[in-house]
Regions:
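Alpha/beta-hydrolase-fold enzymes
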Residues: 144, 150-231
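Short beta-strand element of the alpha/beta-hydrolase
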Residues: 36-46
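Gly/Pro-rich cap/lid or specificity-loop segments adjacent to the active site
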Residues: 19, 47-132, 139, 143-165, ...
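A short loop-to-beta-strand scaffold at the N-terminal edge of the catalytic core in hydrolase folds
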Residues: 19-31
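Catalytic active-site module of serine/aspartate enzymes centered on a nucleophile-bearing elbow/loop
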Residues: 291-292, 299-334
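Short beta-strand/loop motif that positions the catalytic acidic residue
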Residues: 270, 276-278
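Short alpha-helix in the alpha/beta-hydrolase fold that links the catalytic acid
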Residues: 256-263, 272, 283-296
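Acidic catalytic loop of the alpha/beta-hydrolase fold
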Residues: 248-252, 280-285
């Protein structure tokens, strides 16, 4: 096993349901300083794990393990932390409860404090749903987080993104093999439909117009869809992915016991020096939404990733985009 497990025990989630044996999977890079002031928190993305986050970690990069203690934490629902696929009945499969980003970040704060004795975070950063968690960290623990960056993500899910995710969800649950979530095998047709739907959202019009699939080794658009997207989620559990979609849809920075629905107060509470990095062509998290968020934050800057790679501008696919993000993180850590 290439990761560790934080045994959180009985955890009552924001929805009111208790997980009797909650587990949080995490991976660390580097060493914790004796002063415990070199901690970077890097939460996971949708349908991803800590193993997908090495693109921003390495010698000479902002997240240099020789300087920082980098903690990559897997969300509940990721398949490694407590998830529908690994939780015992009666909370397994489709009966797994709704998890919010408030739940995830409260568990992550416990992990740092109880396992490592850490109370101050030098930087929290993340891509996509990882960025949602970065916002939650900075808002819920404003006196503990010194710097924050969200790339191709938001603190609150927009209605348009919510609707897109509904379409993705329907692609899975309308497969006859779904069987209301009590499937005997994965609903492969539904997962294929999910991949095809994602293909039109993850990358931009400009990307497709430029036939960028040819740079990925595909002779035609159909070859690309079949070769890259049709089976992209076959290695993931469907209930896990639906749990993460529910978490994504429920993401609202103000909807928690700290701010009681006052979203503007939740953004205004962020003290951390912040750089928000939307992708110019990201359909999930448009620049305009991040502009509205930054306007509510007292110490935030907006830097747009000028890329045709859509949502993937934040995910390490293109060296230039990754270098742009890395420079922002270096500026925050300077």
């Amino acid at each position: 096993m290439d990761h560790e497990i934080f045994e959180a025990g009985r955890v009552t989630l924001q929805c009111g349901i208790t997980l009797p044996d909650c587990k949080v999977a995490f991976k660390t890079h580097g060493k914790l300083a004796p002063s415990k002031d070199n901690v970077v928190v890097f939460p996971s993305r949708y349908a991803g794990t800590h193993a997908d986050q090495t693109y921003l970690i390495g010698p000479g990069m902002a997240l240099d393990p020789e300087k920082y203690f980098i903690v990559c934490i897997n969300m509940l629902g990721s398949g490694l932390s407590s998830s529908p696929s690994n939780t015992a009945r009666p909370l397994s499969g489709p009966d797994f409860p709704l998890v919010t980003q408030y739940d995830n970040v409260c568990l992550q704060e416990r992990l740092l404090r109880e396992v490592f004795g850490v109370e101050t975070v030098r930087l929290v950063c993340g891509w996509s749903m990882g960025g949602q968690q970065a916002f939650q960290w900075a808002s819920l623990f404003p006196d503990s987080v010194e710097a924050m960056s969200c790339f191709c993500g938001q603190g609150t899910t927009a209605p348009h993104t919510h609707v897109f995710l509904e379409g993705v969800k329907q692609g899975i649950i309308l497969d006859p093999a779904w069987e209301n979530g009590y499937y005997k095998e994965q609903p492969w047709r539904g997962l294929t439909a999910k991949g095809r739907t994602w293909a039109g959202w993850a990358l931009s019009r400009e990307w497709y117009r430029a036939k960028m699939w040819e740079t990925q080794g595909f002779a035609s658009l159909e070859d690309y869809l079949k070769g890259n997207w049709d089976g992209i989620y076959f290695g993931r559990d469907s209930n896990d992915m639906l749990s993460l979609i529910a978490t994504w849809q429920a993401c609202d920075l103000g909807n928690n016991p700290v701010y009681n629905g006052d979203r503007e107060a939740a953004y205004a509470a962020i003290k951390a020096k912040s750089i928000i990095l939307p992708g110019r062509t990201d359909f999930y998290f448009p620049v305009e939404d991040n502009e509205a968020e930054v306007a509510l934050m007292p110490n935030a800057e907006l830097r747009v990733i000028e890329s045709i790679w859509g949502h993937y501008a934040g995910g390490g696919r293109v060296a230039e985009d990754t270098a742009f993000i890395d420079q922002a993180l270096k500026d925050l850590l300077a």
